[in-house]
C-alpha cells in the first residue's frame, strides 16, 4: 500500500522502478523516453501511467507537494477527493520571505516557524493569519503569498499527525539528501547519449543514495498515519483551498 507521496518537481528524476512500496518520493518527472515533464498534461499523463502500473487511485493518500500549480492540478484531477495535499511549509516560508527586505526576513521566518510548530490546527492557523495581517499594510505581496494555499500547508495539523512524523511530512525535505547524492553521480557524466542512458544514470544515482538512507523521523508512527488515512471519509479528508 502506498500512503504518502512526496513531489518536488524542481528535483532530480526518480524512476518508478526504484520507488518504495509504501512511500513514494517523486522528483522531476521524466517519461519513458527521458523527456522532462513540467507542464500539466505531461504530469497528468505520468500519474495516469502509475495507475496503469498498479497504483490504486481510490485509496486515500497524503501528497506532500511544493507550490507548483501543474503538479497540484494533476494530483487533484487524477485522484480527486481521495488526495489530501500537504503543501511544503519550507517552500511556503521561502516564497513569503522572497517578498520581504532582508531586515524583515529573520523575524518573519521565526514567526512562521513557531506558528507551524503549534500542534493544534486552529492555533497554527491563527498565528499565520496574524502574521499575514501584520504584513498586509507594508508588504501586501508577502501577505498574499502567505495566504495563498495556506490551508494546504496545515494538512498535517488537521490530521493531528504526531510531532516527529509531522516534522518529516510537513515538507519535501526528506527527498533532498537523495537528490543531492543523485546529482553528485550525474554531475560526473559529460555525455548522456540518449534518454535511455539518462534514466540509467539517474537510477544509478539513486541506488548510490540508497546506501545512506536512514529511518525517517517518526517512523514508528507511520502505522498511526496509515490508520488516519484509511479511516478518513470523503468529507473529512478534503482540504479547503484559499
Task: Explain the meaning of each model-derived region.
Residues 1-33:
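N-terminal low-complexity segments that are often proline-rich with Ser/Thr-Pro
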Residues 5-8, 40, 90, 200:
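Intrinsically disordered, low-complexity cationic segments
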Residues 34-56:
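Active-site beta-loop-alpha junctions of metal-dependent nucleic acid enzymes
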Residues 35, 52, 80, 97, ...:
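Amphipathic alpha-helical interaction elements
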Residues 35-39, 63, 85-88, 100-104, ...:
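A generic short alpha-helical patch detector that favors 3-5-residue windows
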Residues 41-44, 72-73, 144:
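Alpha-helical elements of the RecA-like P-loop NTPase motor core of helicases
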Residues 60-69, 74-113:
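Conserved beta-strand -> loop -> alpha-helix junction used to position metal-binding or nucleic-acid-contacting
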Residues 69, 118-242:
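Acidic/histidine-rich catalytic cores and adjacent linkers
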Amino acid at each position: 500500500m502506498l500512503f504518502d507521496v512526496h513531489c518536488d518537481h524542481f528535483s532530480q528524476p526518480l524512476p518508478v522502478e526504484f520507488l518504495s512500496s509504501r512511500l513514494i518520493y517523486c522528483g522531476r518527472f521524466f517519461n519513458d523516453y527521458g523527456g522532462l515533464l513540467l507542464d500539466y498534461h505531461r504530469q497528468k499523463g505520468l500519474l495516469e501511467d502509475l495507475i496503469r502500473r498498479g497504483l490504486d487511485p481510490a485509496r486515500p493518500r497524503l501528497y506532500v507537494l511544493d507550490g507548483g500549480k501543474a503538479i497540484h492540478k494533476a494530483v487533484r484531477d487524477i485522484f480527486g477527493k481521495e488526495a489530501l495535499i500537504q503543501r511544503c511549509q519550507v517552500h511556503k516560508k521561502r516564497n513569503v520571505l522572497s517578498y520581504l527586505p532582508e531586515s524583515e526576513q529573520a523575524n518573519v521566518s521565526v514567526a512562521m516557524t513557531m506558528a507551524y510548530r503549534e500542534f493544534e490546527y486552529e492555533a497554527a492557523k491563527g498565528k499565520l493569519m496574524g502574521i499575514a495581517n501584520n504584513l498586509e499594510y507594508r508588504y501586501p505581496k508577502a501577505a498574499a503569498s502567505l495566504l495563498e494555499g495556506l490551508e494546504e500547508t496545515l494538512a498535517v495539523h488537521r490530521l493531528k499527525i504526531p510531532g516527529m512524523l509531522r516534522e518529516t511530512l510537513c515538507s519535501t525535505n526528506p527527498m533532498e539528501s537523495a537528490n543531492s547524492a543523485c546529482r553528485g553521480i550525474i554531475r560526473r557524466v559529460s555525455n548522456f547519449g540518449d534518454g535511455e542512458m539518462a534514466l540509467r544514470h539517474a537510477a544509478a544515482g539513486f541506488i548510490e543514495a540508497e546506501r545512506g538512507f536512514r529511518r525517517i523521523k517518526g517512523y514508528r508512527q507511520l502505522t498511526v498515519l496509515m490508520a488516519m488515512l484509511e479511516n478518513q471519509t470523503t468529507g473529512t479528508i478534503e482540504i479547503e483551498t484559499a
